[in-house]
Amino acid sequence: MRKMKSMKVVLAALFGLSFSWNVCAQQSDIKDQGYVHKSSTSYEYPTDPAVLQKLDQWRDLKFGVLFHWGLYSVPGTFESWLLCSEEKFIPRRTKIFGDMPYDDFKKWYWGLSESFNPTKFAPEVWADIMKDAGMKYMIFTTKHHDGFCMFDTKETDFSIAKGPFKNNPLKDVTYQVFDAFRQKDFMIGAYFSKPDWHCNDYWSRDRATPTRNVNYDIKLNPDKWKRFQEYTANQINELMTRYGRVDLLWLDGGWVRAPKEDIKMDQIIDKAREYQPGLIAVDRTVPGRNENYQTPELTIPKRQLDHPWESCITLTNHWGWWKDAPYKSAAQVINILTEIVAKGGSLVLGVGPTPEGTIEEEGIQ
């Protein structure tokens, strides 16, 4: 009996040490990011039996990977957020680019599409690495807020498939990633940004862009907004019809929601499920029928939760690739995963491939 009590004390101490370590890591990541999205405060279970079945399957997987790969990978910087002129994001830009005028910075950033040429991209290697790490599902950034598409969309030429990589047989990057991971029995997720800062029907080029939001009055420009609604729906339909089985639609940019920025998400999800029955929708930070699981960012809930949830936590201190970024150790990732699973959740680990298309050796170790 004494041995049993001693063992419980040791395990409790180890878990407490692990928890303390995880909290410190989370605080460091949040400080480096400067901003994280807050989780929803309520949850609504889906009613579609096919969705419930797939959600149960997903909850059993526990460990996945979230790739952030796009224009921001070329210089190795803060994803799309340097384009945002909100006060909280300006220090990020000035720290790296000094007093470069904002309009000049935007032109420079958009111009990265002419130099993004990941000639070492080998999706089957990515899949082998993540499978060896014990991961069971994968989410890939098909489009971040900057609007640059990592798939061969018909809606815009602002795409990996239209730049220097266009003659490469792997030019439809999303297709290649999905196919490689599907062959390794991964559940497949498509990250998709609802806001699109490159699209003239979201950030109109004849107006300033002082915030992350649409920069014109929707009520005064209904035709312009309708075009954006159709643009968004068409791109999601492309992903649902041309890329094989898709299990998750992971939607970012929670400020794009009814009533202020209504893109008719209910209709989009209903249509998507006609092509992908049982599709798990993750309209993150927007509680209701289209947020089938919650996504606390760079943090772990303090207590066990009864509903489905996933902590999205970076392997380094950034979502995308940064040169010489510090990696979490294998022991640290295991501790994070252990705490999350003990609380009933899943861990999706953020990994940023290099601009050449490789996973850094330190990240593999």
Spans of model-derived segments:
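Mature catalytic domains of secreted/periplasmic carbohydrate-active enzymes
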Residues: 26-365
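Bacterial Sec-dependent N-terminal signal peptides
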Residues: 1-28
